[in-house]
From Swiss-Prot:
Compartments reported by the entry: Secreted
Protein name: EGF-like domain-containing protein 1
Keyword entries, A-Z: Disulfide bond, EGF-like domain, Secreted, Signal
Organism taxonomic ancestry: Eukaryota, Metazoa, Spiralia, Lophotrochozoa, Mollusca
Cleavable signal peptide: 1-19
Taxonomic superkingdom: Eukaryota
Keyword Glycoprotein among UniProt keywords: no
ZP domain mapped to chain residues: 99-342
Tissue spec. comment: Prismatic layer of shell (at protein level). Expressed primarily in the mantle with highest level in the mantle edge and lower level in the mantle pallium.
Record GO cellular component, one term: extracellular region
Domain EGF-like: 60-92
Disulfide bonds: C64-C74, C68-C80, C82-C91
Length: 348
Protein backbone atom coordinates (compact mmCIF):
# COMPACT_ATOMS: atom_id res chain seq x y z
CA UNK A 1 0.00 0.00 0.00
CA UNK A 2 0.99 3.63 -0.53
CA UNK A 3 0.53 6.09 2.31
CA UNK A 4 0.58 9.87 2.12
CA UNK A 5 2.11 12.45 4.40
CA UNK A 6 3.33 16.00 3.77
CA UNK A 7 6.19 18.38 4.50
CA UNK A 8 6.11 22.15 4.02
CA UNK A 9 9.35 23.96 3.14
CA UNK A 10 8.82 27.77 3.28
CA UNK A 11 9.14 29.93 6.37
CA UNK A 12 8.84 33.76 6.34
CA UNK A 13 10.82 35.67 8.78
CA UNK A 14 10.13 39.05 10.24
CA UNK A 15 11.50 42.17 8.72
CA UNK A 16 14.02 44.24 10.63
CA UNK A 17 13.52 47.97 11.18
CA UNK A 18 14.93 50.83 13.22
CA UNK A 19 13.35 53.14 15.78
CA UNK A 20 11.04 55.79 14.37
CA UNK A 21 9.87 58.27 17.00
CA UNK A 22 10.75 61.91 17.46
CA UNK A 23 8.35 63.93 19.58
CA UNK A 24 9.18 67.06 17.58
CA UNK A 25 7.69 65.64 14.39
CA UNK A 26 4.14 66.57 13.33
CA UNK A 27 1.48 64.21 14.66
CA UNK A 28 3.49 62.63 17.47
CA UNK A 29 2.24 63.25 20.99
CA UNK A 30 4.28 63.65 24.17
CA UNK A 31 2.57 63.79 27.57
CA UNK A 32 5.89 64.58 29.23
CA UNK A 33 8.60 67.01 28.19
CA UNK A 34 9.67 66.84 24.54
CA UNK A 35 13.45 66.95 24.37
CA UNK A 36 15.12 68.76 21.49
CA UNK A 37 16.83 65.54 20.37
CA UNK A 38 13.54 63.67 20.08
CA UNK A 39 12.75 61.57 23.17
CA UNK A 40 9.77 62.31 25.39
CA UNK A 41 10.95 62.74 29.01
CA UNK A 42 8.48 61.34 31.56
CA UNK A 43 7.98 62.43 35.16
CA UNK A 44 7.97 59.88 37.98
CA UNK A 45 4.27 59.03 37.48
CA UNK A 46 4.25 58.38 33.72
CA UNK A 47 5.74 55.79 31.38
CA UNK A 48 5.81 54.83 27.71
CA UNK A 49 7.82 56.29 24.84
CA UNK A 50 5.33 59.20 24.72
CA UNK A 51 4.64 59.23 28.50
CA UNK A 52 1.00 58.39 27.81
CA UNK A 53 0.25 55.93 30.64
CA UNK A 54 0.31 56.31 34.42
CA UNK A 55 2.54 53.77 36.14
CA UNK A 56 -0.34 53.00 38.51
CA UNK A 57 -2.34 51.56 35.58
CA UNK A 58 0.17 48.81 34.82
CA UNK A 59 -1.06 45.21 35.19
CA UNK A 60 0.88 42.04 35.90
CA UNK A 61 0.28 38.28 36.04
CA UNK A 62 -3.32 37.19 36.55
CA UNK A 63 -4.48 40.81 36.42
CA UNK A 64 -3.74 40.89 32.68
CA UNK A 65 -6.03 39.16 30.16
CA UNK A 66 -3.94 39.77 27.03
CA UNK A 67 -0.48 38.69 25.86
CA UNK A 68 1.43 41.72 24.64
CA UNK A 69 3.99 41.06 21.91
CA UNK A 70 7.39 42.56 21.12
CA UNK A 71 8.12 43.61 24.71
CA UNK A 72 4.83 45.44 25.08
CA UNK A 73 3.59 45.94 28.64
CA UNK A 74 0.08 45.26 29.90
CA UNK A 75 -2.02 47.98 31.53
CA UNK A 76 -5.66 48.39 32.57
CA UNK A 77 -5.88 44.58 32.52
CA UNK A 78 -6.52 44.29 28.78
CA UNK A 79 -4.40 46.85 26.93
CA UNK A 80 -0.82 46.89 25.67
CA UNK A 81 1.69 49.71 25.96
CA UNK A 82 3.95 49.39 22.91
CA UNK A 83 7.43 50.66 22.20
CA UNK A 84 7.80 53.29 19.49
CA UNK A 85 8.66 50.60 16.91
CA UNK A 86 5.36 48.73 17.27
CA UNK A 87 1.65 49.41 17.22
CA UNK A 88 -1.64 47.50 17.22
CA UNK A 89 -3.79 46.11 20.03
CA UNK A 90 -1.08 43.60 21.00
CA UNK A 91 1.95 45.52 19.68
CA UNK A 92 2.00 43.00 16.84
CA UNK A 93 2.57 45.46 13.98
CA UNK A 94 5.81 47.26 13.17
CA UNK A 95 5.49 50.98 12.59
CA UNK A 96 7.75 50.51 9.56
CA UNK A 97 8.03 46.96 8.33
CA UNK A 98 6.79 44.43 5.83
CA UNK A 99 4.55 41.44 5.24
CA UNK A 100 6.66 38.76 3.60
CA UNK A 101 4.48 36.87 1.14
CA UNK A 102 5.80 34.04 -0.97
CA UNK A 103 6.23 36.10 -4.15
CA UNK A 104 6.47 39.68 -2.91
CA UNK A 105 7.36 42.05 -0.10
CA UNK A 106 4.50 44.27 1.07
CA UNK A 107 6.00 47.31 2.78
CA UNK A 108 3.85 48.85 5.51
CA UNK A 109 4.13 52.05 7.51
CA UNK A 110 1.90 53.31 10.33
CA UNK A 111 2.00 57.03 11.03
CA UNK A 112 0.06 59.21 13.50
CA UNK A 113 -2.92 61.30 12.54
CA UNK A 114 -1.45 64.63 11.53
CA UNK A 115 1.42 63.11 9.56
CA UNK A 116 2.05 65.35 6.54
CA UNK A 117 5.16 63.76 5.08
CA UNK A 118 5.78 60.79 2.82
CA UNK A 119 7.30 57.31 2.97
CA UNK A 120 9.03 55.79 -0.04
CA UNK A 121 11.70 53.35 -1.18
CA UNK A 122 15.14 54.92 -1.39
CA UNK A 123 15.40 54.28 -5.14
CA UNK A 124 12.91 57.03 -6.01
CA UNK A 125 10.19 59.20 -4.55
CA UNK A 126 7.93 57.68 -7.17
CA UNK A 127 8.24 54.41 -5.21
CA UNK A 128 5.94 55.78 -2.52
CA UNK A 129 3.94 53.80 -0.06
CA UNK A 130 0.33 54.77 -0.67
CA UNK A 131 -2.32 55.44 1.94
CA UNK A 132 -4.71 52.54 2.50
CA UNK A 133 -7.40 51.56 5.00
CA UNK A 134 -5.86 51.50 8.44
CA UNK A 135 -6.39 48.58 10.81
CA UNK A 136 -5.02 50.52 13.80
CA UNK A 137 -7.22 53.26 15.33
CA UNK A 138 -5.49 56.62 15.50
CA UNK A 139 -2.88 55.69 12.90
CA UNK A 140 -2.64 56.25 9.14
CA UNK A 141 -1.47 53.23 7.17
CA UNK A 142 0.68 53.32 4.02
CA UNK A 143 1.49 50.29 1.89
CA UNK A 144 3.31 49.21 -1.27
CA UNK A 145 3.70 45.71 -2.72
CA UNK A 146 6.89 44.87 -4.64
CA UNK A 147 7.11 41.48 -6.36
CA UNK A 148 10.37 39.57 -6.06
CA UNK A 149 10.83 39.64 -9.82
CA UNK A 150 10.15 43.37 -10.24
CA UNK A 151 12.86 44.85 -12.48
CA UNK A 152 11.67 48.47 -12.33
CA UNK A 153 13.40 51.20 -10.35
CA UNK A 154 11.31 50.10 -7.36
CA UNK A 155 12.67 46.54 -7.49
CA UNK A 156 14.05 44.81 -4.43
CA UNK A 157 17.65 44.07 -3.52
CA UNK A 158 18.19 40.30 -3.46
CA UNK A 159 20.92 38.45 -1.57
CA UNK A 160 21.75 34.75 -1.51
CA UNK A 161 22.69 34.25 2.13
CA UNK A 162 26.04 32.63 2.89
CA UNK A 163 26.86 30.23 4.51
CA UNK A 164 23.20 29.24 4.90
CA UNK A 165 22.73 27.79 1.42
CA UNK A 166 19.19 28.23 0.18
CA UNK A 167 18.38 31.29 2.28
CA UNK A 168 17.35 34.33 0.26
CA UNK A 169 16.90 37.87 1.56
CA UNK A 170 14.94 40.63 -0.18
CA UNK A 171 15.37 44.10 1.21
CA UNK A 172 14.89 47.80 0.62
CA UNK A 173 15.75 51.04 2.37
CA UNK A 174 12.68 53.06 3.35
CA UNK A 175 12.82 56.83 3.73
CA UNK A 176 10.29 58.51 6.01
CA UNK A 177 10.08 62.28 5.77
CA UNK A 178 7.81 64.31 8.00
CA UNK A 179 7.52 67.27 5.70
CA UNK A 180 6.45 66.73 2.11
CA UNK A 181 9.19 66.93 -0.54
CA UNK A 182 11.99 67.52 1.94
CA UNK A 183 14.61 65.76 4.05
CA UNK A 184 15.82 66.81 7.50
CA UNK A 185 17.67 65.60 10.56
CA UNK A 186 14.41 64.41 12.16
CA UNK A 187 13.54 62.16 9.23
CA UNK A 188 14.25 58.44 9.25
CA UNK A 189 15.68 55.71 7.09
CA UNK A 190 14.82 52.08 7.84
CA UNK A 191 16.29 48.96 6.29
CA UNK A 192 13.46 46.45 5.88
CA UNK A 193 14.18 42.80 5.11
CA UNK A 194 12.29 39.64 4.30
CA UNK A 195 14.31 36.45 4.68
CA UNK A 196 13.07 33.24 3.11
CA UNK A 197 14.46 30.05 4.61
CA UNK A 198 14.07 26.46 3.32
CA UNK A 199 13.50 25.23 6.87
CA UNK A 200 11.06 22.34 6.98
CA UNK A 201 7.92 22.69 9.02
CA UNK A 202 5.90 19.51 9.20
CA UNK A 203 2.20 18.94 8.82
CA UNK A 204 0.18 15.76 8.49
CA UNK A 205 -2.80 15.10 6.26
CA UNK A 206 -5.16 15.27 9.23
CA UNK A 207 -3.75 18.54 10.61
CA UNK A 208 -6.24 21.44 10.67
CA UNK A 209 -6.10 22.94 7.18
CA UNK A 210 -6.80 26.41 8.57
CA UNK A 211 -3.30 26.59 10.08
CA UNK A 212 -1.45 26.65 6.79
CA UNK A 213 -1.39 28.78 3.62
CA UNK A 214 -1.68 25.64 1.52
CA UNK A 215 -4.05 22.70 1.70
CA UNK A 216 -2.50 19.56 0.24
CA UNK A 217 -4.66 16.60 -0.72
CA UNK A 218 -4.53 13.55 -2.98
CA UNK A 219 -7.15 12.00 -5.20
CA UNK A 220 -7.60 8.94 -7.38
CA UNK A 221 -10.49 7.78 -9.52
CA UNK A 222 -12.60 6.81 -6.51
CA UNK A 223 -11.78 9.35 -3.81
CA UNK A 224 -11.09 13.06 -3.61
CA UNK A 225 -9.04 12.70 -0.42
CA UNK A 226 -7.18 9.42 -0.75
CA UNK A 227 -4.61 8.43 1.88
CA UNK A 228 -3.77 4.91 0.69
CA UNK A 229 -3.65 3.25 -2.70
CA UNK A 230 -1.98 0.39 -4.58
CA UNK A 231 1.36 0.44 -6.38
CA UNK A 232 1.29 1.90 -9.92
CA UNK A 233 -2.20 3.32 -9.42
CA UNK A 234 -2.66 6.83 -10.89
CA UNK A 235 -2.85 9.54 -8.27
CA UNK A 236 -2.98 13.33 -8.27
CA UNK A 237 -1.52 15.64 -5.65
CA UNK A 238 -3.39 18.93 -5.24
CA UNK A 239 -1.99 22.10 -3.66
CA UNK A 240 -4.72 24.66 -2.96
CA UNK A 241 -3.75 28.19 -1.81
CA UNK A 242 -5.75 29.49 1.14
CA UNK A 243 -5.67 32.31 3.70
CA UNK A 244 -3.64 34.54 1.36
CA UNK A 245 -6.04 36.99 -0.31
CA UNK A 246 -3.64 38.17 -3.03
CA UNK A 247 -2.78 34.66 -4.20
CA UNK A 248 -5.06 33.38 -6.97
CA UNK A 249 -2.80 30.68 -8.36
CA UNK A 250 -0.25 28.11 -7.25
CA UNK A 251 2.09 25.78 -9.08
CA UNK A 252 4.65 23.30 -7.82
CA UNK A 253 8.20 24.58 -8.28
CA UNK A 254 9.92 21.72 -6.45
CA UNK A 255 8.69 18.31 -5.34
CA UNK A 256 10.74 15.66 -3.61
CA UNK A 257 9.27 12.26 -2.75
CA UNK A 258 11.04 10.48 0.07
CA UNK A 259 10.78 7.72 2.65
CA UNK A 260 12.62 6.66 5.80
CA UNK A 261 13.26 3.07 6.86
CA UNK A 262 11.96 3.01 10.43
CA UNK A 263 14.39 0.22 11.39
CA UNK A 264 17.68 1.29 9.82
CA UNK A 265 16.81 5.02 9.60
CA UNK A 266 18.01 4.96 5.98
CA UNK A 267 16.68 7.84 3.91
CA UNK A 268 15.93 7.71 0.18
CA UNK A 269 14.43 10.42 -1.98
CA UNK A 270 13.38 11.12 -5.55
CA UNK A 271 13.30 14.63 -7.02
CA UNK A 272 10.09 14.59 -9.04
CA UNK A 273 9.85 18.28 -10.02
CA UNK A 274 12.65 20.85 -10.15
CA UNK A 275 12.25 24.45 -11.31
CA UNK A 276 8.71 23.52 -12.32
CA UNK A 277 9.83 20.70 -14.64
CA UNK A 278 9.28 16.94 -14.23
CA UNK A 279 12.54 15.04 -13.65
CA UNK A 280 13.81 11.65 -14.74
CA UNK A 281 14.09 9.23 -11.81
CA UNK A 282 15.48 5.79 -11.03
CA UNK A 283 12.01 4.37 -10.37
CA UNK A 284 10.91 5.21 -13.92
CA UNK A 285 7.81 6.91 -12.53
CA UNK A 286 6.23 9.56 -14.74
CA UNK A 287 5.27 12.92 -13.24
CA UNK A 288 3.29 15.77 -14.82
CA UNK A 289 3.34 19.23 -13.25
CA UNK A 290 0.10 21.06 -14.07
CA UNK A 291 -2.54 23.33 -12.60
CA UNK A 292 -6.33 23.42 -12.74
CA UNK A 293 -9.07 25.88 -11.90
CA UNK A 294 -10.99 25.13 -8.72
CA UNK A 295 -14.60 26.15 -9.49
CA UNK A 296 -15.41 26.44 -5.78
CA UNK A 297 -12.79 29.11 -5.08
CA UNK A 298 -11.98 30.41 -8.60
CA UNK A 299 -8.30 29.83 -7.81
CA UNK A 300 -5.74 27.93 -9.85
CA UNK A 301 -4.41 25.06 -7.77
CA UNK A 302 -1.14 23.21 -8.24
CA UNK A 303 -1.58 19.68 -9.61
CA UNK A 304 1.00 16.92 -9.93
CA UNK A 305 -0.05 13.67 -11.62
CA UNK A 306 1.96 10.57 -10.88
CA UNK A 307 1.77 6.84 -10.27
CA UNK A 308 2.02 5.40 -6.78
CA UNK A 309 5.30 3.65 -6.06
CA UNK A 310 7.23 2.15 -3.15
CA UNK A 311 10.62 3.29 -1.87
CA UNK A 312 10.76 1.15 1.28
CA UNK A 313 8.32 -1.70 1.86
CA UNK A 314 5.67 -0.91 4.49
CA UNK A 315 6.92 2.63 4.96
CA UNK A 316 4.97 5.80 4.16
CA UNK A 317 5.84 8.09 1.29
CA UNK A 318 6.36 11.73 2.27
CA UNK A 319 6.60 14.91 0.25
CA UNK A 320 8.90 17.89 0.50
CA UNK A 321 7.62 20.70 -1.73
CA UNK A 322 8.03 24.33 -2.60
CA UNK A 323 5.24 26.22 -4.35
CA UNK A 324 5.19 29.26 -6.57
CA UNK A 325 2.33 31.60 -5.63
CA UNK A 326 0.89 33.93 -8.26
CA UNK A 327 -1.64 36.79 -8.22
CA UNK A 328 -3.48 35.01 -11.06
CA UNK A 329 -2.79 31.82 -12.98
CA UNK A 330 0.91 30.95 -12.87
CA UNK A 331 2.84 30.88 -16.12
CA UNK A 332 3.95 27.40 -17.16
CA UNK A 333 7.74 26.96 -17.25
CA UNK A 334 9.46 25.91 -20.46
CA UNK A 335 10.81 22.40 -19.93
CA UNK A 336 12.84 19.95 -21.96
CA UNK A 337 11.03 16.84 -23.16
CA UNK A 338 10.71 14.41 -20.22
CA UNK A 339 12.93 11.36 -20.35
CA UNK A 340 10.08 9.08 -19.25
CA UNK A 341 6.55 8.77 -20.58
CA UNK A 342 3.96 11.35 -19.64
CA UNK A 343 1.62 10.55 -16.79
CA UNK A 344 -1.73 9.18 -17.74
CA UNK A 345 -4.11 11.78 -19.06
CA UNK A 346 -7.10 10.13 -17.46
CA UNK A 347 -8.82 12.35 -14.90
CA UNK A 348 -8.01 11.31 -11.36
Amino acid sequence: MFYLSTFMTIVISLSLVSCSYDCNNPGYSCKGTCHYYGPCICNEKLMGYDCSVLKSRMSTGSNCTVTCQNNGKCYDGSKCLCSSDYTGDLCEKQTTGARCTLDAVVFEAYRPIGFVGETYLSQSRSCKLLETTSDVPGMIKFERKIFHGDTSMCGLKKHMDIPSAGDVTYEADIYSTFQYNSWGTRDFMDNVKCQYKPTRVGLSMDAPDSLFPIKMSARDGASSNVQATTQSAPISLLFSPQNIPDVKGAMVDYLEVYSINSTSKEYKSVVAVKNGCAQKNEYNVAFSNLDELDPATSKWIGLVKMQAFIIFENEPILFNYRLRFCPDRCTTPTCAAPXVGQATSAAV
